Design a protein with these regions (language model features):
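Membrane-embedded alpha-helical bundles that constitute the cytochrome b-like, heme-associated redox core
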Residues: 1-202
Length: 202
């Protein structure tokens, strides 16, 4: 057992860009003066989510959706074992974490779509209310995700936040991924920037 690469560069950059852009979009949501900034951040969130879906299909081993497809019974079993202090260990996303990711992606897409609709005045006040509800629901899911990371990290004696920065976790060498091509670094960044620029041409 030793330190092995689990999270590739695009996954890590995409993750932290999503953290930043969602935070910016949320804290500027109620400010009329910062409305354009809010919309730009929202477009960036959308662009990053599009990239994440793509990377979930074409990315490296632990970034792919097929590596964290779990049944509800597996999630319940994992949570039960976690409560007993004997949770199973996954190098990639664990069963509970995988569901949080899927929910966050779906909520994120719904929030962005409703936000765009409200911005172009489709649906009127009703759509704006839907957007607000989805935004706060996503915030709640983010909080649950963070708590899950803390509990899982404590249970497995891992620094999961650090691993999402440097990409490394404890594991066997045969379980490591190959470093992704450096040019992939520009993909999540370009997605965020290009999506943000859309606000100025629509």
């Amino acid at each position: 057992m030793g330190k092995i690469l689990v999270w590739d560069v695009p996954t890590r950059i995409g993750h932290w860009l999503l953290v930043i852009t969602f935070t910016l979009s949320f804290i500027t949501g109620d400010s009329e003066e910062q409305r354009l900034f809010h919309v730009a951040a929202g477009y960036a969130v959308g662009g990053i989510l599009v990239f994440r879906i793509f990377w979930g299909i074409a990315g490296t081993r632990y970034a792919r959706f097929v590596s964290f497809l779990f049944t509800p019974s597996e999630v319940i079993g994992y949570l039960g074992a976690l409560v007993k202090g004997k949770p199973g260990h996954w190098l990639g996303h664990n069963p509970a974490g995988s569901y949080a990711i899927y929910i966050l992606i779906l909520l994120g897409i719904a929030t962005v779509v409703s936000g765009v609709a409200a911005y172009v005045e489709i649906g009127g006040d009703w759509m704006a209310e839907v957007h607000d509800v989805l935004s706060y629901t996503m915030l709640g899911m983010v909080v649950i995700h963070i708590l899950g990371v803390i509990v899982s990290g404590w249970a497995h004696h891992e620094n999961l936040v650090l691993s999402m920065f440097n990409g490394y976790k404890q594991g066997k060498s045969k379980e490591a991924i190959e470093p992704s091509k450096k040019y992939w670094i520009v993909v999540p960044i370009a997605s965020a920037i290009l999506a943000s620029l859309l606000v100025y041409i629509t």
